[in-house]
Amino acid sequence: GDVYKRQSTFYFEFIAVDNNNQSSEISKLIVNKGIVNYSRELKFSNLKCVSRITGAEINGTNGLPIVEFEVNNRTNELYNVGGTDLGIVWELQPGHYGLFFGDTFGSDFYPNFVNPGPNGSNWRSNVLLFSDDQDLSDGLTINGATMDESGKNAREICYGGKDGSGNGDWTSIPTAAIRANGIDYVHYMNIRNWAGWITNFSSLYKSSDNGITWTRCQNVKFGSTSNFGQVSYFKKDGYIYMVGTITGRDNKPHLARFLEENIENQTEYEFWNGSGWIKGNETAATPLFNDISGELSIAYHPEFKKWILLYFNSTRYDISFRTADHIIGEWSKPQKLVDGWQYSQLYGSYIHPISLKGNILYFIMSMWLPYNTYLMSAELKCNP
């Protein structure tokens, strides 16, 4: 194919290698201007909505289309999950995935054209469902949940106070999840007031029994104006990389990292300031690029040797797609992965780990109407 070149910053890259001959992305040193080859840019095509993951069949209810996307699961009947959003997915054990959902309502939930979004009874700030599905081409199958004592309801994991006054503990919303050293962690934001996405703090819960019981990690806490109030995690070369923003959808992404064993030791977190890693000083972090983002999802694709970042952009009203050879950049310009004018009231774009095998990108997207989650797919291809 044609090779496209442009003047850009040229980098020397220094790679640290540990005793197991594993490399670690640690730094890039800017030395001069040069020519960078952009011929192997990662592109996507053939975007599809594969299926709806959560909620009941709609079939014309409240004016919605008679034929909607196929629903793979009866979450309203089996787990009392009628309306929900997000679907942050990670791998607990090989082939066993957890999916964290946000504010969740029971089987009496119904999509409402006049006032879309949450409604109904049995409000839980978050729930955790499970999937062992290895073939997502026909949809994502849910086959379990962390249930309450009655065995009838998926239970709340991260406590939310349900105080809608705007001056207390409104709800607790998951933003990312990961397994580190055999323990599963969820990062969440504790919402004080949805007007302005004001939080009390962000923190972690952890589980040592594959997602059945969870406890709060009291020693990890991010303030209400932290650049890591909402995050996405990815493990690579012994590190967990954390891309985050101030809570909301109007802020630029920042980058941190820590060794896997230090996830509960916040003093060991390192923050990227544009030229190096700064330990223990969160305010040193500088933006990865100049673009506002919400509901980030980061992953490294080993076959394409590319980092992939998905996020909601409110200005363009889309799910944006960026790539980079190294997580510290240089990041590609945003591509429009999903158009909000085609999928109205869209948000969230959480990459399924199964995407990192092969050339199909699977991600979970939400729509405010009908306030449920969808499995999306796109084909990936690198320019030759």
Task: Write out the residue ranges for each language-model feature.
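Extracellular fibronectin type III
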Residues: 21-37
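Conserved blade-ending motifs and adjacent loop-strand segments that build the rim/top face
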Residues: 331-355
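Structural signature of eukaryotic scaffold interfaces centered on beta-propeller domains
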Residues: 83-92, 166-182, 227-238, 292-303, ...
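Short, small-residue-biased leader/transition segments that mark boundaries at the very start
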Residues: 1-4
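N-terminal regions that are enriched for targeting/export leaders
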Residues: 36-180, 186-189
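Conserved Ser/Thr-centered positions that define the repeating blades of beta-propeller domains
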Residues: 89, 131, 207-208, 258, ...
